[in-house]
Amino acid sequence: MGLFCINTGKVKLSQAGFEGKEQIIRLAKDSDILGYRALISGEAYSATATVIEDSKICLIPKEVFYELLQHNSKLTSGIMKLLADELKDAEDKITNIAQKPVLERLAEALLMLKEYYGVEDNDNSLNITITREEIANIVGTATETVIRLMSDLRKEGMIKLDGKRIKIVKSDALLKLANLYD
C-alpha cells in the first residue's frame, strides 16, 4: 500500500455500481497522485485504477508518505486542499446527476475532458482516446444514450467524431447546453 504518482499517462478510477456496472469516478493524468485518501483514512482503496494510455507510475511506500506528512507542512496543506477539492467535485457530481438532464451532463463531461486533458494542437480533438461506454460511465447513463446524444451533437455541428477521437467544434454551444454560463 502506498501513494501512486503518475509521471506520464492517463488512468481512470472506477467503482462497480448497481449490478456490477462500472462508474468512472475520476480521471487522472500526468502529475496526479492516487491513493492518498485510503492512506489517510487507513481503509482499503475502494476504486479500481486502470491505465487507459501508456503510463509511467511510481509508488511511494506508506511509511515514507506518513513521514513526509509529519515533517512537511506544505505537503500536508496540499493534501488537505486535494481532499477538499475532491469533496467539492463529488458534491457537484451528486447535484448534477440528481438535477441535470443527460444531455446537459454529457455536454459538461465533454467540456471537462477538454479542460482536463486539453486538445491536439492541429485539430482541437480531445487529447484522450475514450470509448462511448467510458463517457457513459462518467455521465451516469447508458452507452446507447451517449451514442444517440453524441450523434445529435455531431449533427448540430458541436462536435466531430472519428472512432474514439472527439473533436470539439463549438465550445460555446456546449457551454450553453451544459448551462455553465454565469
Language-model regions: role of each:
Residues M1-L3, K21-Q23, A44-Y45, D123:
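A short beta-loop-beta micro-motif enriched in histidine and acidic residues
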Residues R26-K88:
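Cyclic-nucleotide recognition modules
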